[in-house]
Amino acid sequence: MKIAVMSCIHSNYEALNTVLLDIDKHSCEKIYCLGDLVGYGPYPNEVVAQIRSLNVTTVAGCWDEDIVEGLNSCECSFPSLLAEKRGKLAHEWTNKEIHPENREFLAQLPHTFREGNMAFVHGSPYSNHEYLLPELDAFVALERVLSTESDVLFCGHTHVPYVRTLDAAHLQVRIKGENGKEQERSFTAPLKKIVNVGSVGEPRHGRPNATYVIYDTNTQEVTLREVHYDYHKTVKAIIEKGLPAIFAWRLAQGMEFAERADDPTHVCTR
C-alpha cells in the first residue's frame, strides 16, 4: 500500500491543494498529516476545513496546540527576540481569524498516532517543539524511535525533508539500579528509520516548492516528493492580510530567516 505523509501546511491553501492533486496522481491509498495546519500563512480556516473534509489522519503540531490554548510559545522556543516578535504577530493574527469549529478540530488532535510498524509525530515523540535534525546524535535518534515501539518514525517540524536509516547495532548501556549502583546492559537494536517529510506550506530546503513523502508499506521505499505550485498567490495574500512581510520573503526563497537555536532538543518546561 502506498501512503502519503505531509506536514507543516501553515495556512498555505495553494500549496495544500497542489500537493493533494499530486497525491491523487500517484494513487496513494491513505493520507497522514503531521500537524502545523496553521501559523505564518494567510488561509488558516481554508486549510483546516480541507483537512477536515477529507478526513485526513492528523496529529497536532506546535502551532495547532498554541492556537487551541490561546498562548504564544515562550521566548526560549525562538532562536532570537526578533523571531519571537514575528512569531507572536502571526499567532495573534491566526488566533483572531480561526473559526470556532476549526479551533475545536485542532483541539482534539492527538500528539502521536501509530499504525502497524509506523509512528507519526510532529516534532518528536516527547514534544512537538523538539527538532529531530538529520545530524542528531545517533543514540538519541535511535532512542526517539524505540520510544514509539515502531520501525519507522515519521516527523516534520524542521521544514527540511530527509530520510535517516539507523542501522542494526549491538549497544551497551549503563543503567543505575535500585541500589544506586551502575549496571551494564547490552541489547541489539534493529534497523529503524526516521523520515522527515518536510513542509507543504513553508519549505526551508532552499526552494519554494512544497514537499511531502510517499511511503510504500510493502517495500518500505521512501519517495521524497517536491511539488511546484504558484507560491506568488500565497506571497501576495500574506502581504494583503497584514502579516509580517518577512514571511512572504521566506516563502518565496524557501529559506529560514533566523538563526537556529543552540540546542534543538531543548524543550521549555514553563
Regions found by a protein language model. Give the residues of each.
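Metal-dependent catalytic neighborhoods of phosphoester/phosphodiester hydrolases
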Residues: L37-L54, I67-P79, Y131, R164-L166, ...
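Active-site neighborhood of divalent metal-dependent phosphoester bond hydrolases
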Residues: L54-M118, S127, Y131-E149
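Acidic, His/Gly-rich catalytic cores of divalent-metal-dependent hydrolytic chemistry
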Residues: A168-R270
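N-terminal active-site segment of His-dependent metallophosphoesterases
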Residues: M1-V56
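Hydrophobic, aromatic-enriched interface-forming segments
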Residues: A138-F139, E143-V173
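Beta-strand-turn-beta hairpins that frame and shape the catalytic cleft
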Residues: M1-I3, F113-F120, T188-I194
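Short beta-strand scaffold segments in enzyme catalytic cores
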Residues: T112-R114, P161-T165, T211-Y215
